[in-house]
């Protein structure tokens, strides 16, 4: 196992440059601010959203900025078959032996895809209680984290990683828009709405990559994990949700279309949300309204949505983008007397989304658009 650990941690043997990593300052800062807390930090989010890259960017900061000794940092990917017969405690013990580190010496542990480990929550509790370690862990499954995190109550925080926003997209594309070229903002922004914010897809533009990602989530993370007998039904459900992204999703209507029971439709919808393929937005109101009223459905990534529905209804795509920008403000939608307002944030800010043809001349001014897109 020693050889495997050295392969995952090249900074143990040489000065590592981390040259291939593209910076993501905003989500990285959200992760960094927990660096000196005692909490275990969980990174969650859609498959291939960049959780591994963010863990490695933090490792880079620890070595280059915080001056942490490289041997005090250990990264492992727990979906590696070669590590499948070892539990986390055994791996960490082996790591400490390699570098002659006692349990009292502080180390930084980066445990990628932690949910591949059976009883991971008990092992993390043991590490938390008995060793001096700062622990960062990642998972692409909200359902696994929700069912097992009670063991870690009071010991952990969860940070959801979202796709690249417009400014990050421009960085990944190596595009800088000067004031003189601000008229190009619209063009690049519409390209962004088509492409979405999955880092690897932004860099490569390979449609098969997106299709493979969706199939992996549907058939591995949902069908196989939940032992669903009709895989095609889940693919049909996915396509239906993509068509209805940005709209209020009536469970009864969905159930009728798919010819399944409403309870089954509701349960399957929650499975999609737990894999971060879709986000659900509740209606504003008293608790009974929030629970019982149908939810609005938004795609987790604009590129995935465009792939399966085409580049049409740009206003709806823009609304989806705005939702992703304000998701951290826990928005709900307002529906009163037949009228709807797109979002009411936790800070009591009402947001009605409009795009171009719906906007006034002043709102269409490029400087206004740039401020909005910088968000």
Question: What are these language model-derived features?
Answer:
Residues 2-9, 15, 140-142, 146-243, ...:
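Interdomain motor-coupling "hinge/lid" segment immediately C-terminal to the ATP-binding subdomain
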Residues 128-150, 272:
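Sensor-1/coupling segment of RecA-like P-loop NTPase cores
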Residues 1-20, 53, 60, 64-68, ...:
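A cross-kingdom feature that marks ATP-driven nucleic-acid transaction machinery
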Residues 43:
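Hydrophobic anchor at the beta1->P-loop junction of P-loop NTPases
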Residues 74-104:
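Short glycine-rich substrate-engagement loop in P-loop NTPases that contacts/grips substrate
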Residues 46:
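P-loop (Walker A) phosphate-binding loop of NTP-binding proteins
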Residues 50:
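Conserved glycine(s) of the Walker
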Residues 18-36:
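Pre-Walker A adenine-sensing motif
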